[in-house]
Every structure is written in structure tokens, then in C-alpha cells.
């Protein structure tokens, strides 16, 4: 596996010269990311990735060095990959190794999960065995609310909240198709992943948040070796080294 992105092998991971990003007002402090306004640019924000990992809705925390940069660079590559395929995202640029420049959105309080292989909560709450292929993939919705432990929502409940889930589902399945094709080239199974969406000031829907192993499950084909946050959840290995492996592979295929 490779070294720290942006240090010992900068050209392998990113081709741009890092810039100094001056943060303005903090708009939102998440578990592992911070969102900042930009002076004189009301339609744009900076999204800063921290060297931090959490599990259990923040009940378990660690601060692995290099994790923020790695997730940021993976997200930049995958957002660019989606944009090239006609999927609208909040991504604009990656001005620094740990910071994205993004469109300012009103985030929809619903997390969208796409499942291709059974793992995680679907195994814990049903009789489905881990590793079972799910074809066609299923799309689930969860309320974005840590205090309520992000409960599962039905399609109708999302509609009762005043949100039409259909456009999000359609985009999520498009993202799934494109990610599956990409990860298959890398010898990786895309088990499942979480997406967030938001509206811009014109009411247009955009893919938001991040695209990284922090919000995906990635297994090596044939062995089920993990390259995602389950390594931290299950205390099975070094997530930064696993994430760097994914970043190195992505650079060869996107």
C-alpha cells in the first residue's frame, strides 16, 4: 500500500498544486467534516475533511493521521467521475488535499442506502445471511437524525415528510451502476453505500456529502477483505492504509 497522500508521493494521488484555503464562518460541524461559508460567494462552501473516524453515531472515536486527506481525494475523484456521466453533484473543485469547494445546498434530512450484497443492518434486522447477493439492488431510506439513531423510513413516510424520494432513488441507482462498473475493474465488490442529497437555491437536486469508503462497504472479490469503515467498527485493521489502497486503485481507472 502507498504512503501518505500529498507527502511522499503527491503526483500519484493528485495532480494539482495544493492551495492554502482560508476558511470563513463555520456553517456546520459534522462528525468528521466541517462546512464553511466563503466571503462574497454565497452559493459556495468549503467542505473540510478531518483526521477523524467515528462509529455508533459518534460513540466511538479515533483520529487516524491522513484519513481526512484520503477521503477528500477519493471523494473528488468519484464526484468528478459522476459529473462526467451526467450525474449532478455539489462538487466544484478540490483546492486543497483535505478540502472540497462545493455548491451550497439545503440538505435533505434523509439518507439513501443502496444495497448490492447483504451486510450491516439488513443482516441484523432480518433473516438474510451476510454476503447474499441482492439483485436487483434495493434502495432504503433512513432519517438523518443521530438522536433517534437514524430510523428506517418507508417510501410513504418520506412522502409524508414532504419529500419526494423518487428522484433520489433514480439518481442513487445511477450512481450504483457507475460505481459498480468502476469497482469491478478494481477487483472490488461494492456491497452497499450511503448517499445524501440537497437542493440548490433554484430547487435543483444534487448529490451531496462525500463518496468514500467512509460511506461505503467495499470487499475484495473472492476473499471479502474489507476496505471500508467496518475495519474500524470491528477493530480488524488500519482504515487509512485500506483507504489509501482504494485511492491508488482509483487513480488507475478514473
Language-model features, listed with the residues they occupy:
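Juxta-kinase regulatory segment immediately upstream of eukaryotic protein kinase catalytic domains
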Residues: 5-15
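A short glycine-rich, hydrophobically flanked beta-strand micro-motif that places a catalytic Asp/Glu
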Residues: 92-97, 185-199
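Short beta-strand elements
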Residues: 49-50, 116, 206-213
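Short histidine-centered catalytic/ligand-binding loop motif
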Residues: 59-69, 148-171
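Active-site loop/lid in soluble adenylation, ligation, and acyl-transfer enzymes
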Residues: 15, 19-143, 250, 254
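A long amphipathic alpha-helix within ATP-dependent nucleotide-binding catalytic cores
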Residues: 161-191
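Conserved metal-phosphate-binding beta-hairpin within the catalytic cores
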Residues: 114, 190-209
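C-terminal helix-cap and adjacent tail motif
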Residues: 211-254
